[in-house]
Amino acid sequence: MCIRDRAHPAGVGFHYLDHLTHNVFKGNMDKWFAFYSDLFNFREIRFFDIQGKHTGLFSRALTSACGRIRIPINEDRGETGQIVNYLKKYKGEGIQHIAVGAHDIYSSVDTISDLGVKFMPGPPEVYYTMSHDRVVGHDEPIDRMKKHGILIDGEGVVDGGETKILLQIFSKTVIGPIFFEFIQRKGDDGFGEGNFKALFESIEAEEMSRGDY
């Protein structure tokens, strides 16, 4: 391998940074919203109230004025939960996960899986069985989604034939408590609202398996 090859290694198909998720102490969400809003002119575009099997969280999704930088802010609903666990392990507030975007999520996920990346537990079989009811008219390959546990969300194929689909999958923690999200957007600009609870419960299950609760 020549020096030039080492300087420009082959990629795995991720082309842009989609968003960063910021975990904060309970009660600090408004403070951090003011920070991003006052200094960088961010605005709120989504608010989530998520309840898992044992714990819950609030999430306030922000975007920059140009719309290209997005930062959801998360805080726990109670005194215990995955955000509290993160804050203890991270020893403070910080980035929970980094989302990177692909043009072909199936190929990219196959590649990084072969390289040893491990993923959060996938959803049950019924999730895929009912995917056409949730995301109308989608023609995503169910077998390839199930292979690694890729999630699907969005409005599907809407009036006029426009496609609004989001595909996403999450790694297990790789840098302390930090993990990665791998995402492909097909006309959908959301955060996978329909999958948010599935992700929350997957993290919850992994933490329970480690004895964190």
What spans do the regions from the language model cover?
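Residues forming anionic-ligand binding surfaces in small-molecule and nucleic-acid pockets
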Residues: 7-15
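Vicinal oxygen chelate
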Residues: 15-26, 83-117, 169
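Core segments of cupin and vicinal oxygen chelate
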Residues: 24-70, 107-110, 114-117, 125-136, ...
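Active-site lining segments that contact anionic ligands and/or coordinate catalytic metals
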Residues: 57-59, 68-70, 95-97, 164-167, ...
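Aromatic/basic-lined ligand-recognition segments
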Residues: 73-79, 134-170, 183
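TerminUS-proximal long segments
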Residues: 168, 172-213
